[in-house]
């Protein structure tokens, strides 16, 4: 069955239209010119994604599945989560209405535009958001899922999003450490090209080891075989996977010419340990016994002035003067990757790209200043894995000197990840305020081992009883109390890190 098999006057009935997947399905079908009606057991006031249906002529029945809905529908699309034993399936069978599953919609209604995917451990959201801004600034409309407070990199969302109306697709491709997820997103979103920011340890609790995680990310490379791939050439994991998979397609590399901040070990794809002269965590200059080494880069940033937020970019064609509002060397990597993507995928001239970059203030929850209280600035950042924490805190210390770090993280790599994060915070911070239960446990152990750390680690109560949800490691009250404690210390720059810090950033309004 394909799209042409449905007459123009076909009416599709979508059950569970207040849920993310069926909301997107309804909008796809309406975008393709069909009649769509919806139903949901939620009330109109409680319909989570009701706002995204505004502008669509879709009749929605709330709080019930009325007879009228089934009388009007030529086909029914139920939500994935609805069990086949549900009473509504008895009604569908009794009325002999054909059923299409969400996966049928994906198979039948093909992607009709170029689609670009962005993956990696850190930097995905900033890269995706900036590339979209450049598109909008140049009258190119990227598809938007418009699902309020949804990040949008979960499996079905990017796949369905790619089928909505728009000139191009620009998709963040994430994984919760589940093998096969990225493969399905890349294939079903019909990516034409993509970008990998970096690959550093994450989700180790689910996968067991770094190489297992890296090979989940490698599904992105496999899915783009024969196509265009833009990569951070200073990440040995990415370059090692490209070699291991014998990638046959166009590879465009980018990186940064900067003095390394130190040397760290990283597992090479060959199985050996490789010393990386790091510019940011996990990326820099490297040479492994297996022969893997930093390549000559196609795009390279030089003469970086972080204070003035400027750098020169050497492209295959010319040298560019780049001005940005973003802070930190990690954002130089992000901006360079975006420049390459905007030029190669969006086919925009450099001058148009640079104009847009110069006015990009960043993404909510990424190095975001949320308050100035007295003489103290409070910043939140989503950093939630060891590499992300190290990179962000190193840049903050470089830019501002002494910092107080409030930890709200519960690592997706379990206790090992929590300990590694705490050690990174210990390295770069004047003071540490452990606000998450996971960090408080480690703080107790650290102080027991080294009592002198009481001056640095501010822990004036026992371990909070909090059950983590993903990387959400603290409650609203715990984040607020942590920041409040930080305000009483003799340090004027406070950074609260982790998902809870960004989710509950409005807690500063009460301080």
Model-derived regions: residue spans:
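Phosphate-binding loop of NTP-binding sites
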Residues: 4-9, 28-32, 67-69, 80-250, ...
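Acidic, Mg2+-coordinating active-site environments of NTP-dependent enzymes
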Residues: 68-73, 78, 84-97, 192-378, ...
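ATP-dependent carboxylate-amine ligase
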Residues: 1-45, 54-59, 72, 76, ...
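Short, surface-exposed amphipathic charged segments that create phosphate/polyanion-binding patches used
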Residues: 74-79, 113-120, 157-162, 208-212, ...
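Structural beta-sheet core signal
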Residues: 38, 144, 171, 194-196, ...
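Short, ordered loop/turn segments at secondary-structure junctions
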Residues: 41-42, 65, 104-105, 147, ...
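A polyampholytic, Gly/Pro-enriched intrinsically disordered region
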Residues: 117-128, 167-169, 270-278, 452-458, ...
